[in-house]
UniProtKB/Swiss-Prot annotation, chain A:
Gene label: metN
Organism classification: Bacteria, Pseudomonadati, Pseudomonadota, Gammaproteobacteria, Oceanospirillales
Protein's job: Part of the ABC transporter complex MetNIQ involved in methionine import. Responsible for energy coupling to the transport system.
Annotated ABC transporter domain residues: 2-241
Protein name: Methionine import ATP-binding protein MetN
Membrane topology field: Peripheral membrane protein
Species the sequence originates in: Chromohalobacter salexigens (strain ATCC BAA-138 / DSM 3043 / CIP 106854 / NCIMB 13768 / 1H11)
Disulfide bonds: none
Keywords of the record: Amino-acid transport, ATP-binding, Cell inner membrane, Cell membrane, Membrane, Nucleotide-binding, Translocase, Transport
Length: 347, 217
């Protein structure tokens, strides 16, 4: 549904040029919720704004529903934009219009008749739970309600794609959850393809099917959300995940961690297991079969996109032989093992 | 005070109102589109024309820097061309309009400046044409600010119109100078000033009321 091919965006020229996006390829299938996560300044915003050409890419193609938007003239692009709803971090509602009239705006722009506007706006207000707020002005609404208005407005032109630019970043956690639920609901009911950018892992975890990680203008990693949460492929991915899960080894241990194994060290590992392995009595079996002692430092179970994910940080205490056998055994059970370092015994 | 005097005062008041209303309406009619043009042709804006914008901005600034009393005298030939005379209330309206247009334009531009850029972006994302952005987003969103600017303009026009009295423009300023100053009649002077004060208060209250009604923030 959305396809970016070799999209680059450069601001300025020469040695002071800023390469906001570097050769981005992205393919979001019909009906998917695709998240792009990254730190601020990584190019997320530029990326999503390139999809509806609010920013024109310096090079590359943007194809939405089979149409190459980068080749369209101004009029054709305006028509295409009716297919692309967009919501923003700061809602961008018109203060001078009531809730109803804000939602009606895209229809007015398309030249829809007054009676048809009423017919199309009312179900949207119903869908977003705003029917009783129709006559109010945005200033009278809470942040969550404003974003609901923005969502209703974005859906008014019956788009095929919804672009969400940090749509929940200005909202508190509870409101965020309700907005995410609404987006998921829309995705299911209307089959709408959603591309969202965010810096919040919570958003990715709650509703995304796939996630891309953007860093310094490059898409450095892309995976199904379940896989990303089990085993991020990049350092940045792991940093995001660990910060989100608050799954860091205790500070006192971190200070003692050594990068290489010695004759008297034992490994500290981060284990991630998903699906059926979560239910198995893994650690006690490991201790029994390989003869290592396992000291659990942190553990947590998360549910991501219907998949259960177990995460653990543990010290494997035993001789180098037994610990390496334990590691092999863990990997044989389809457990993602990351050795964080080694600590001296009896330290 | 004689009834002739009262009649004179009434006539002068109506003359002033006429000058202010006519010059206010015409300068709004021309100044608002000019202010919009100054805004939308800026670099990076929806109808960016950086060079034309620059020229327009300079012309506007020149218009604003000429003192009204000088402008009034300087454009007498132009005024005569338009209304056929260089004295009287109609003749005073011409320089008032010329002076107020750039004033209104800058105030409108300032009001448009207050609109969050995200709103224009949202409208663009909805597929709005530049004309639709102006009529459906910019003008309605800046309505309060524009009304505020027009109120300031009208109040300024009240005092400018009094200045127009100096060149035989009629109105309260004319009355105040001829009777109050030249004939040294402090009562007439006081009355004309009092009427001007009341007029300004009235326009300001009306303007404030309209701004409040337009504002949903």
């Amino acid at each position: 549904m959305i396809k970016l091919e070799g999209v680059s965006k450069t601001y300025g020229a020469g040695p002071t040029a800023v390469h906001a996006l570097k050769n981005i390829d992205l393919d979001v299938p019909q009906g998917a919720i695709h998240g792009v996560i990254g730190l601020s300044g990584a190019g997320k915003s530029t990326l999503i704004r390139c999809v509806n050409l609010l920013e024109r890419p310096t090079s590359g193609r943007v194809i939405v529903d089979g149409q190459d938007l980068t080749r369209q003239d101004a009029e054709a692009l305006r028509q295409s934009r009716h297919q692309l709803g967009m919501i923003f971090q700061h809602f961008n509602l018109l203060a001078s219009r009531t809730v109803f009239d804000n939602v009606a705006l895209p229809l007015e722009l398309m030249g829809v008749s007054k009676s048809d506007i009423r017919e199309r706006v009312e179900p949207l207000l119903d869908l977003t739970g705003l029917t009783d707020k129709a006559r109010q002005y945005p200033a009278q609404l809470s942040g969550g309600q404003k974003q609901r208005v923005a969502i209703a407005r974005a859906l008014a032109s019956r788009p095929k794609v919804l672009l969400c630019d940090e749509a929940t970043s200005a909202l508190d956690p509870q409101t965020t959850a309700s907005i995410l639920e609404l987006l998921q609901d829309i995705n299911r009911k209307l089959g709408l393809t959603i591309l969202l950018i965010t810096h919040e892992m919570e958003v990715v975890k709650s509703i995304c099917h796939r996630v891309g990680l953007i860093s310094d203008g490059e898409l450095v990693e892309e995976a199904d959300v379940g896989d990303f949460f089990t085993a991020p492929a990049t350092r940045l991915g792991r940093d995001f995940l660990n910060a989100f899960l608050e799954l860091e080894p205790p500070q006192a241990l971190v200070e003692r961690l050594e990068e290489t194994a010695g004759p008297h060290t034992h490994p500290v590992v981060r284990l991630a297991f998903s699906g059926a392995t979560v239910a198995t009595p893994l650690i006690s079996r490991l201790a029994r079969d390989s003869g290592v002692d396992v000291s659990i430092l942190q553990a947590k179970v998360e549910s991501i996109q219907g998949r259960t994910l177990g995460l653990m940080i543990a010290e494997l205490i035993g001789s180098p032989d037994t610990t390496s056998r334990a590691l092999t055994q863990l990997e044989a059970h389809d457990i993602n093992v990351e050795v964080l370092g080694h600590v001296q015994r009896d330290a | 005070m004689s009834s002739a005097m009262l009649e004179l005062i009434l006539e002068a008041t109506l003359d002033t109102l006429y000058m202010v209303a006519l010059s206010g309406a015409v300068s709004a009619l021309i100044g608002i589109p000019l202010g919009v043009l100054l805004y939308v042709t800026r670099p990076g804006q929806i109808l960016a024309q950086p060079f034309a914008q620059r020229v327009l901005a300079i012309v506007t600034n020149i218009g604003r820097s000429i003192p009204f009393i000088i402008l009034m005298v300087a454009i007498i030939p132009f005024t005569r061309l338009i209304v056929g005379s260089s004295i009287g209330t109609n003749a005073a309206v011409v320089p008032l309009i010329i002076a107020a247009i750039p004033f209104v334009a800058r105030l409108v531009e300032g009001a448009l400046n207050e609109i969050p850029p995200g709103l224009i972006e949202a409208a663009q994302a909805m597929g709005a044409t530049p004309y639709q952005i102006i009529t459906k987003v910019l003008l309605p969103e800046a309505k309060g600010g524009i009304l505020n600017g027009l109120t300031i303009t009208v109040v300024t026009l009240v005092s400018y119109s009094a200045m127009a009295g100096a060149v035989g423009g009629g109105g309260l300023g004319d009355l105040g100078i001829r009777y109050g100053y030249n004939r040294f009649d402090p009562l007439i002077m006081l009355i004309t000033v009092a009427i001007l004060v009341i007029m300004v208060q009235g326009f300001q209250s009306l303007g404030d009321h309209l701004v409040r009604k337009a504002d949903h923030k």
